[in-house]
C-alpha cells in the first residue's frame, strides 16, 4: 500500500512541470510516502513493526517455560532495530565500512553493509538455537522472514548503491524501483518473523474467565502462562 502510494505520487511528479504548485505538491506527497526515505510514514511504520516484534519477543520471555534469556535477547534486537529505523544509526557504520571497503578493494556505494553483515551474522548465530527450537510452523516463518529481510537489507540495498553509482548519484526511476523492492522485502520479512513468534501464542476465552493466554513452548503441551 505504502509503495503503491509512493509510486503513484512519483508518476504524478514526473508528469508535471517543475516549479508548478502541483509538481511541488506531488513531490511533498511522494517524499511523505517514499519507502526509501527516512523519518516519514513508511519509516515510522517499519519502526512500529520492529516494536511489535520486540513486544512479542518480550511477551514470550515472560510466558515461556524455557529459553527466556534468548527471548529477551530477541526483544532487545527488535528494540535496537526500531530505534535504528527512526534514527538511521546503521548509516553511521560507513565510518567503519569505508576503510574496510578500501582495504578489500570493494567498490561499494553503501559501505555500511560490510559491518552490517558482520552484525547480522553474530545476531543470527546467537538467536539460531532459539529459532531452531521453535515448533515447525513458527520456526519456518521466522527463518523465512529473516532470509527475506536480509535479502532486502543487504543484497538489494547493495544493488541500489550500484544503481546510484552508475547514474552518478542521481536519483532515477531505476534507483526508486530497486529501493521499493528493498523496502518491501524488509517489511515482508519482518511481518513473517512477527507471525512466526505470534504463532507460539494461543489466546482463548473461557466461560469462567475473560481471556487465557497460552504460550506453546517447544516441548510438551501448551501450558497456561497468563491471563
Q: Where in the sequence are the language-model features?
A:
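Hydrophobic alpha-helical segments at protein termini of multi-pass membrane proteins
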Residues: 1-227
Amino acid at each position: 500500500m505504502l509503495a503503491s502510494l509512493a509510486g503513484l505520487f512519483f508518476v504524478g511528479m514526473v508528469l508535471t512541470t517543475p516549479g508548478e504548485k502541483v509538481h511541488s505538491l506531488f513531490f511533498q506527497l511522494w517524499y511523505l510516502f517514499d519507502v526509501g526515505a527516512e523519518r516519514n510514514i513508511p519509516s515510522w511504520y517499519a519502526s512500529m513493526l520492529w516494536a511489535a516484534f520486540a513486544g512479542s519477543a518480550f511477551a514470550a520471555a515472560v510466558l515461556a517455560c524455557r529459553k527466556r534469556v534468548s527471548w529477551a535477547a530477541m526483544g532487545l534486537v527488535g528494540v535496537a532495530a526500531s530505534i535504528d529505523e527512526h534514527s538511521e544509526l546503521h548509516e553511521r557504520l560507513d565510518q567503519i565500512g569505508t576503510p574496510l571497503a578500501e582495504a578489500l578493494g570493494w567498490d561499494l556505494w553503501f559501505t555500511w553493509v560490510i559491518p552490517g553483515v558482520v552484525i547480522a551474522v553474530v545476531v543470527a548465530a546467537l538467536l539460531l538455537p532459539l529459532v531452531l527450537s521453535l515448533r515447525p510452523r513458527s520456526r519456518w516463518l521466522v527463518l523465512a522472514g529473516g532470509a527475506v529481510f536480509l535479502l532486502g537489507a543487504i543484497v538489494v540495498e547493495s544493488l541500489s548503491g550500484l544503481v546510484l553509482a552508475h547514474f552518478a548519484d542521481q536519483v532515477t526511476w531505476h534507483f526508486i524501483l530497486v529501493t521499493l523492492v528493498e523496502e518491501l522485502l524488509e517489511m515482508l520479512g519482518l511481518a513473517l518473523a512477527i507471525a512466526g513468534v505470534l504463532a507460539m501464542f494461543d489466546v482463548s476465552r473461557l466461560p469462567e474467565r475473560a481471556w487465557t493466554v497460552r504460550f506453546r513452548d517447544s516441548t510438551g503441551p501448551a501450558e497456561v502462562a497468563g491471563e
